[in-house]
Amino acid sequence: MRFLAAGAAAVGTAFLWRRQVEEDGPKRALKPDTALMCPLQSKQWVSADSMLLRFGLPSDEHVLGLPVPGHVMVIDDASIYRPYSPVTIDATTSGHFDLLVKHYPGGEISTQLARMRLGDLAHVRGPCGSDFTYRRGVARRMGLVAAGTGITPMWQIIQAVLNDPEDQTRISLVYASRSTDDILLRREIDAAAARHPDRFTARYVVSSAAEGETLPAGTSVGRIDAALLREHLPPPTASADERSRVLVCGPAPLLRALCGARARDGPTAPGQRRPPLGGLLRELGYPSEDVSWL
């Protein structure tokens, strides 16, 4: 019941955003009160347990209709929901959207998605957002910390910033994975960093490496700790003109370590107060108002 309530709040949050933008721009496929039926157009396994799924929209002129960052709820026949953040954004993609899905043994939704064949329909609801929505000028510098599939909403933000020629926000990404083979979207991330070396940097951390493995540039073995964050994230805000924002997305242990023991307890609707910031980010001097977890 708590999961369903959280989903309803997120849909309501994004509905407020949608009302502000629905009068302009392309056709938006998602409607808060209706499930969208999306045919599977392609499926590609990108790691041992993760797949990239492309779903069609009603026409080539339609965009999905999500804020950045945003997610959709994928629903099965038993009305079980699972949130997924697309790795495509409305600003650059129409006619389809892509989901990066990790297949968990015993996971009902991810197992059904893994079994889908081309042409099968997925039931999708949204738009869903969080209490942080990216807009140009929200910060001068952004630090993004992700683990596993927590990279997906971060990739939305990276695309939104780097594809806007008027946006001069600088982004630093710290991304943790189990191994180099599990670094999702690495090719796309590295290509973006190569195109925008003055605006975007990426640092990878893996839990382990094979004996004798040569790690790619920008990759280290270990864990996300205070020294790594201090080196690669922007410093805490020093002035209004140089505001820093830090976003964190990943499994509960990461959120607790970086943001405090109650990080998962925070409400998601705008205007509601989150639990006080704790963890490593507080130790490093970041104020609560400059940190969000997704």
Residue ranges and their predicted role:
Residues 1-24:
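Terminal signal-anchor or tail-anchor transmembrane helices
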Residues 6-14, 174-294:
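Reductase modules of NAD(P)H-dependent flavoproteins
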Residues 25-120, 177-179, 207-209:
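Ferredoxin-reductase
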Residues 126-138:
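A short, basic/flexible loop-to-alpha-helix module at the beginning of a structural domain
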Residues 135-141, 240-242:
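Short helix-loop-beta connector
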Residues 139, 162-171:
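Conserved S-adenosyl-L-methionine
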Residues 141-143, 172, 245:
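Structural motif
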Residues 151-165:
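Histidine-anchored nucleotide/phosphate-binding helix
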